[in-house]
Amino acid sequence: MADGTETGADANAETVTASVIGGSGFTGGELLRLLAGHPNFDITEVTSRSKAGKSVGSVHPPLRGSDLRFTEPDDLESVDVLFAATPHGVSMGRIDDFFDIADTVVDLSADFRLESEAQYEEWYDGHEAPEYLEKAEYALPEINRENLAGADLIAGGGCNATATILGLYPLFEHGILEGGEQIVVDVKVGSSEGGAGGGEASSHPERSGVVRPYAPTGHRHEAEIEQFLDTSVAFTCHAVDMIRGASATNHVFPSGPVSKGDLWQAYRGCYEDEPFVRMAAGGSGVYRYPEPKAVAGTNLAEVGFELDPSNKRIVVFSAIDNMMKGSAGQAVHAANVALGLEETAGLEFTGLHPVGAP
């Protein structure tokens, strides 16, 4: 197999073979779209039990004209990188097989996001391969770049957790928050979060026009947020009438005085040089604060804030496309870092305006 760890100019010229396991869903389709336009990746296999034998373009319209076809996931060819876009529980059961055929595994499910078996017992239904948990690296280069470089197992973050963590991280990194402060997180997310299979609550007649609390407490992404920021949060999630997007409004109550200058210093210090984070903090015009519509189809995250001195509160906003920055785009970005490729390769699209409901 090709060595996927070269750096510099050679890395930008090399071809990296890749398979996508579970490529028939929405996230799998986004991943295939990105890899098909990537200057380095060569897709050799796309699997789906339910769609085996069908052309990829018949399921994912952006890939019409591609000669790729879905295959059964049982007999896989050796590749440099294996992307797993499967439901929770699949990757942990097949992780040994994945590493038999690939040097690097990028898992987009929840199977390796948490650090300990005890966390999976608490938040999920246990874990079949706990020995891999300490080997996995969380797929957010903005705050985990050093550890992702050369990583063999990459764990994609949850979309709601990604939006929340990117919004709050600078406050901890720059000492505005130290842990223990009250943080209330309110996330609104589009219907694509439920996947292509959906369900009764995701059907158009039931979903259209809603602002529906579906996880007032106990959302599993809360575990990721608390793990990464090392603090507790009060987290609530709403299903809303859009297809793409996750918007997090974070109400933060710091223990000491904070100025707008402090906030700008923190956020610029963390994100000024990041290619996929842009600030939207007040100003003028229609798009004054982060919103999913402005980043639909991109790997961008928008972050902004307002200070509420009378209530001793900071309101932090963050917005992403849940299928891109919250999943497929994040996975490709992390893979670029792990393999020493150009970070922005395959992810340069900056969005459209105007657009309809994302």
Regions found by a protein language model. Give the residues of each.
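Short, solvent-exposed beta-strand edge segments and adjacent coil->beta transition regions
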Residues: A151, G245-T249, R313-V315
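Oxyanion-binding "anion nests"
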Residues: G218-I243, S247-T249
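N-terminal Rossmann-like NAD(P) cofactor-binding subdomain of oxidoreductases
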Residues: M1-R207, R212-Y214, E306-P309, T344-P358
